[in-house]
Amino acid sequence: GKMNSYEKSYRKMFKKSPAFISNLDKDHILTGEDIIFIKDVENSIPVASVNLIGRKVNDSVDKHQLIRSNSINNKIGAIIVARCGSLRLPNKALREIQGRESIALVIDRIKRCNKIDQIILATTHEDVDDQLVSIAKREGINYYRGSTENVALRYFEAAGSFNLDHFVRITGDAILCDEEMIDKAIVSHLKSSCDVTFMTEMPFGTHKEIVSLNTIKTIIETASNPNNTEYLEYYLKNDRYFNINYVGSGYKFNHKLRMTLDYEEDLQFFSTLFEHFNK
C-alpha cells in the first residue's frame, strides 16, 4: 500500500540528491566525477543519477548546487496521438474546419509552443492512417507508426525513436490545447524534476500532461492490460509509482466546459467558433 505520513517524513529526513561536486561552466559535459550526493534540505524530487552522465550543463553552476532536470539539457517533444478508426466520429482527424483538417489545427497550435524541440504525430500501421502520415509530411513535422491498441507503447516507441527525455501528451481531438499553458507546464516540470506534470484549472480537452520517458516505460512494464492504455491519465495519476506535479492556469474556468472533438455536434460547435474568430 501507500507509505503513511510518518514513513514519508522519515524518508525525507535522510534523503540525498545528486549535486554538482564543484563549480562548472555552461555546456560542460557531465561525468561520474562531477556528481556528489548530499542531503536535500529542500525535500524536493531528486533527478535519477543514471540519466545525468553525458548531459550538458545548461548554465554555469555552483559547487554543491542540487541537480534538477532544468540544470541539464533535455529534449522535449510533443507527441500527438491520432488515428482514423474513431467509432464515435469516424475520420474525425480528417474532418475539416474552415478548410483545415482538425489534426492540422492541433499541429498549428503546438507549433506556437516555445519550449518544444520536436513535434511527432504518432499513428498506427493501418492503411487508413496513411492519410495522417501525408498530413504530417505536408505540415513539416515528424511521424511514427506503432501499435493500434497499445497506446502507451506507441507513445514510448515514438519518444524513444526521436530520443526524447520528456514529452507532452497530446490527443488528436484536442483542437484548443493551450500553447502558453504547455510552455508553463514544461518549465514547472523540469524545475520540479517530477515524473509527470498535470495542468489544472483548465476546461476539459485543453489540459495536457508532461511525461518523462521513464514514466511511460514503467506503465508499459506494469500495466495489467496494455491494450487498455488509451486513457493514459488514470495510470499517470498513480502516486504510488510516480512523483506528480500540478500547474494551475491561474484562471477560473467553468469545469463543465468540454472542448474536445468527439461527436458530430462538436464539429459543428468548432466550425462556428473558428468562423466567428476568423472573421
Region locations from a protein language model:
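Short, well-formed alpha-helical segments that are part of the catalytic scaffolds
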Residues: L89-R112
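Conserved alpha/beta core of the MobA/IspD/sugar-nucleotide pyrophosphorylase nucleotidyltransferase superfamily
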Residues: N73-N74, V211, L232-K279
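Conserved donor-nucleotide/metal-binding helix-loop-beta segment in metal-dependent transferases, i.e.
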Residues: E157, F162, A174, D178-P203
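Basic phosphate/pyrophosphate-binding loop/patch that engages nucleotide-derived ligands
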Residues: S161, K184-D195, S212-N228, Y235-N238
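N-terminal nucleotide-binding beta1-loop-alpha1 segment
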Residues: N73-P90
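Catalytic cores and adjacent flexible loops of soluble metabolic enzymes
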Residues: G1-N73
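Short aromatic/hydrophobic "clamp" motif used to bind/position activated sugar donors
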Residues: F167-V168
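Conserved N-terminal catalytic core of the sugar/cofactor nucleotidyltransferase
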Residues: A104-N163
